[in-house]
């Protein structure tokens, strides 16, 4: 009887024509989960949509902007989902699977024009064998709800659906809503990052900070790298002036200063590499943005301390696009003013019954905004996914291959005017700070002997800060039985992360004459040199290494290092969770996280070269007139810090959390216990003379591995009777989080959270002698609201850190590298804010930003003396991004204009607050044209005003020193003006 009822009701729907209303409506809807997307479409079209929440649960609706008929707009919205629609009354449309039973694997039913009703045969009914008990009851509930919606205008749906089937997932109905209900565009968005179960959580209910971006929104940012994208997050300051790889990412109120120790980059919920505080490595350098990304979710703190890698900072989770029942794809080409040529592509569709696939990626080559006379960026990425759906869940496999080379950029010479907070920076003579860099054909190659009698080390700057990685993963989500679900995320990553770059060394430019005079003084102070040379030096000869021409004594020169680093990485992670519905509205999650990882490093730091202080520098040979050779083929010295180490780590964590909804309240609490085990070896080194000739000044004091090792192993340490040191290698720590959200209305909520997290020491921390575990206590309260024209999200926080290690390589007066280490705490208070206002139709005004008051405390060790109470290095007290955007409807096509003004406040480059980085502002803009349903043209530009913004001062200068000398300074500016033009075809 029930089956007959389903068929009768379904057949009554089939013969009803699609909307005959051919008038145009204006739509502006972003890519988002299908439920919220359909709700927003209903609101903007002023119609009723009826659909089952089960049916749309795993789908994403497409972005639509412009003027369309209701039928055309709905087709565009549902493009790629495999869903179809039928009219059931004058103002009501029902959403269905192509075959009417929710199976997305079959080809979608073509929707006829409004003037031509579909024949009944257009929607075949499958046999009863395809309908399990749960789906049958869900469909009956949906169809009863449909009858109520048609009869009563959609207002009696909820009660009838609940009466139909209390245990089935509640079908959803979207009706025209007033201004107060326009929250579905943002607050109804379902997020999966930082949540206990794979089903996710509405943003309205999340008791923590989360920022989301669709693929289209990611493109609008115009990010130069995966790190640069994080500027959409209110509390993130990403220093991306180093290029597509190798950034510094600062989180407001979190300690930092180098790399990105408090940022995890994940793919589909699995961290790419589970240790985040290694030198010459950050997660963002292992990831590239392209068309294979569906959306990004960035969570800051909150419940992140419980799940996955337990990141107490930010987790940027990138969800990959998957194939759907309806084949879709796109291909595009982008050209840029920096000599950029880039091709992107994506294709996804069905492979077999219940199987779906996707492939995509990019390839690009670029001269770079700072041209180096060879490709600055060259490489690409390929990603594939395979998804299988079955009655009780889904499994998705993915593979990602990244092979890329990126120019690494450090500090350049600048003119410093003024002092303290009044300092300003301008161009050094002959060196454009927006487009210049030392690298060029003359400095591209390195050949240097690093040990007595061994073959020379060779390296190429064109290999840059590269990545050669292979990543494989899978996500399994199963409904085990009533009230029990399972989620398992597995990922394996392996590959090579090399660094070949010029690192400026601790002293601003000086004239060749002044440099030679200092070298003469040093050589004459060495008795062995004077004896071998037959007396003291009184003069010098300097020539260009490339052509032998004499160098003018007034030419400015510098000594910069050609650093060569190789990191061989492997990691395996598994995140397994069971979620139990203990009783209605209460869910308990228990889980286990395992990470096994290794890093095999070989470093050659130093390799200092004497070069001109100009873009595309020339190497200089310098010889004193007593025969002493200061620089040979530009080299003033070989490796001053040679490191060979091998480390392995294993982290095992168990966690439990519970969420409980009580009327308008949603509470959650959880605890995590984690053990870390680390072992490894470091080869010791000895300072050696590479030959017996005292006149060869360039090969003295070379760091050479000597075959002896320091072993970091708990079992060995215990055998040697040093149990205290064993504690450095094996640690067990706990983390916890408690939060709650109160929903005042369906479009307004407030939340509060308290959590304590830990940050385990990395391999580098053990090597540097700072093996302590960091701790954070976080307190925050937030408020979210959305009306038809306004969205606001405000978070106020108090964060306390302890046991944070500090490490920096500084250059001594002799030119050698010294490793400066100490530990400290942090006291931080601040506010994050996100807002969007639409004062008139088509115009939106958006803002994101942060204000903070964060200072050092509890400094331990002389290296940080005097820093207590100082402002955290590199972090602005205030930063904000303001983006007005305007949509111009043009019939079947439309134009979108946007402009972004960014303000970055004053910062300090060092803990001693002596190296001041002035505030600056930038202006970015873009125009996007959607031409019909298939073509998109995008014109974007960044830093249009060519602002000189400095992100760091001399990275090798000791804390507490100004980093300037004689009006000269070193600093790393942001990139100058850049523009790109892209054309994409969608099919």
Language-model regions: role of each:
Residues 286-330, 986:
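A beta-strand signature from Gram-negative outer-membrane beta-barrel systems
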Residues 376, 382-389, 394-471, 498-563, ...:
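Acidic/polar loop-and-plug regions of large Gram-negative outer-membrane beta-barrel proteins
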Residues 801-805, 842, 902-910, 928-987:
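C-terminal beta-signal and adjacent terminal beta-strands/loops
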Residues 271-300, 424:
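Short acidic/polar hinge/loop motifs at secondary-structure boundaries
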Residues 661-664, 745, 791, 798-800, ...:
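Gram-negative outer-membrane beta-barrel transporters
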Residues 315-350, 359-372:
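Short strand-turn segments of transmembrane beta-barrel domains in outer membranes
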Residues 176-179, 191-195, 199-202, 207, ...:
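Extracytoplasmic beta-strand/coil segments of soluble accessory domains associated
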Residues 569-571, 581-597, 602-606, 610, ...:
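Structural signature of Gram-negative outer-membrane beta-barrels, strongest in the C-terminal barrel
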């Amino acid at each position: 009887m029930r089956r007959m009822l389903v068929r009768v009701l379904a057949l009554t729907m089939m013969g009803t024509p699609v909307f005959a209303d051919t008038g145009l409506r204006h739509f502006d809807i972003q890519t988002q989960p299908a439920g919220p997307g359909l709700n927003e479409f209903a609101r903007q079209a002023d119609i009723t949509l009826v659909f089952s929440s089960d049916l749309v649960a795993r789908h994403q609706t497409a972005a639509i902007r412009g003027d369309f008929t209701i039928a055309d707009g709905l087709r565009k919205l549902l493009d790629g989902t495999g869903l179809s629609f039928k009219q059931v009354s004058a103002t009501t449309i029902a959403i269905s699977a192509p075959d009417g039973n929710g199976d997305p694997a079959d080809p979608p039913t073509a929707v006829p024009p409004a003037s031509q009703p579909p024949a009944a045969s257009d929607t075949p009914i499958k046999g009863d064998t395809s309908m399990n008990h749960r789906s049958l009851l869900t469909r009956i509930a949906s169809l009863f709800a449909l009858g109520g919606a048609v009869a009563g205008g959609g207002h009696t749906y909820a009660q009838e659906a609940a009466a139909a089937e209390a245990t089935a997932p509640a079908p959803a109905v979207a009706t025209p809503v007033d201004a107060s209900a326009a929250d579905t565009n943002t607050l109804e968005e379902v997020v999966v990052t930082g949540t206990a179960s794979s089903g996710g959580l509405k943003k309205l209910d999340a008791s923590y900070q989360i920022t989301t971006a669709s693929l289209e929104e990611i493109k609008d940012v115009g990010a130069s790298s995966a790190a640069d994208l994080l500027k959409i997050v209110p509390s993130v300051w990403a220093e991306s002036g180093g290029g597509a790889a190798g950034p510094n990412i600062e989180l407001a109120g979190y300690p930092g200063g180098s790399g990105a120790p408090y940022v995890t980059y994940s793919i589909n919920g699995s961290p790419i590499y589970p240790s985040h505080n290694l030198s010459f490595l950050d997660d963002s350098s292992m990831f590239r943005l392209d068309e294979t990304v569906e959306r990004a979710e960035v969570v800051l703190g909150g419940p992140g301390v419980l799940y996955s890698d337990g990141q107490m900072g930010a987790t940027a989770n990138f969800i990959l696009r998957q194939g759907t029942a309806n084949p879709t794809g796109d291909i595009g080409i982008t050209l840029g003013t920096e000599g950029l040529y880039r091709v992107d592509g994506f294709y996804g569709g069905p492979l077999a019954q219940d199987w779906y696939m996707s492939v995509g990626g990019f390839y690009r080559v670029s001269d770079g905004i700072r041209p180096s006379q060879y490709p600055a960026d060259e490489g690409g990425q390929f990603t594939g996914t395979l998804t299988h759906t079955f009655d009780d869940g889904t499994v998705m496999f993915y593979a990602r291959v990244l092979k890329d080379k990126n120019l690494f950029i450090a500090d350049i010479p600048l003119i410093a005017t003024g002092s303290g907070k009044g300092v300003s920076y301008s161009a050094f003579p002959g060196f454009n700070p927006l487009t210049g860099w030392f690298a060029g054909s003359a400095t591209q190659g390195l050949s240097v002997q690093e040990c007595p009698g061994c073959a020379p080390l060779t390296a190429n700057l064109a290999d840059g800060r590269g990545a050669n990685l292979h990543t494989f993963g899978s996500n399994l989500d199963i409904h085990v039985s009533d009230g029990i679900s399972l989620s398992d995320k597995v990922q394996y990553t392996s590959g090579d992360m090399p660094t070949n770059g010029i690192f400026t060394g601790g002293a601003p430019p000086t004239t060749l004459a002044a440099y030679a005079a200092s070298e003469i003084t040093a050589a004459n102070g060495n008795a062995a040199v004077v004896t071998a040379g037959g007396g003291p030096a009184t003069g010098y000869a300097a020539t260009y290494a490339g052509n032998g021409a004499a160098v003018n004594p007034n030419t400015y020169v510098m000594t910069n290092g050609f650093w060569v680093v190789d990191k061989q990485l492997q990691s395996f992670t598994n995140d397994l969770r069971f979620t139990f519905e203990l009783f209605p509205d209460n869910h308990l999650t228990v889980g286990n996280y395992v990470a096994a990882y290794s890093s095999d490093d070989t470093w050659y730091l130093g390799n200092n070269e004497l070069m001109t202080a100009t873009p595309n520098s020339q190497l200089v040979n310098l010889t004193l007139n007593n025969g002493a050779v200061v620089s040979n083929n530009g080299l003033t010295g070989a490796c001053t810090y040679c490191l060979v180490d091998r480390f392995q780590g294993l982290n095992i964590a168990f966690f439990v959390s519970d969420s409980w909804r009580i009327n308008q309240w949603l509470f959650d609490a959880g605890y995590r216990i984690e053990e870390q085990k680390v072992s490894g070896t470091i080869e010791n080194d000895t300072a050696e003379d590479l030959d017996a000739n005292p006149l060869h000044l360039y090969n003295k004091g070379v760091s050479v591995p000597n075959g002896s090792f320091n072993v970091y192993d708990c079992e060995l340490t215990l055998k040697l009777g040093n149990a205290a040191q064993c504690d450095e290698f094996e640690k067990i720590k706990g983390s916890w989080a408690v939060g709650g959200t109160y929903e005042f209305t369906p479009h307004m909520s407030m939340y509060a959270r308290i959590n304590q997290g830990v940050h385990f020491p990395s391999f580098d921390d053990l090597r540097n002698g700072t093996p302590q575990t960091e701790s954070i206590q976080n307190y925050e309260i937030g408020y979210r609201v959305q009306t038809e024209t306004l969205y606001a999200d405000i978070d106020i926080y108090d964060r306390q850190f302890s046991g944070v290690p500090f490490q920096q390589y500084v250059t001594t007066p002799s030119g050698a590298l010294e490793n400066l280490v100490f530990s400290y705490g942090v006291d931080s208070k601040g506010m994050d804010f996100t807002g969007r206002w639409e004062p008139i139709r088509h115009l939106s005004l958006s803002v994101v930003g942060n204000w903070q008051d964060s200072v050092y405390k509890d400094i331990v060790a002389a290296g940080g003396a005097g820093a207590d109470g100082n402002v955290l290095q590199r972090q602005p007290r205030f930063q904000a991004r303001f983006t007005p955007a305007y949509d111009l409807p043009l019939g079947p096509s439309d134009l979108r204009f946007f402009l972004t003004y960014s303000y970055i406040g004053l910062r300090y480059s060092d803990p001693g607050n002596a190296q001041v980085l002035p505030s600056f502002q930038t202006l970015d803009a873009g125009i996007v044209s959607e031409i019909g349903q298939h073509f998109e043209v995008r014109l974007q530009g960044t830093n249009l005003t060519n602002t000189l913004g400095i992100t760091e001062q001399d990275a090798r200068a000791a804390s507490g020193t100004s980093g300037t000398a004689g009006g000269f300074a070193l600093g790393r500016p942001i990139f100058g003006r850049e523009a790109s033009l892209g054309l994409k075809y969608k099919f």
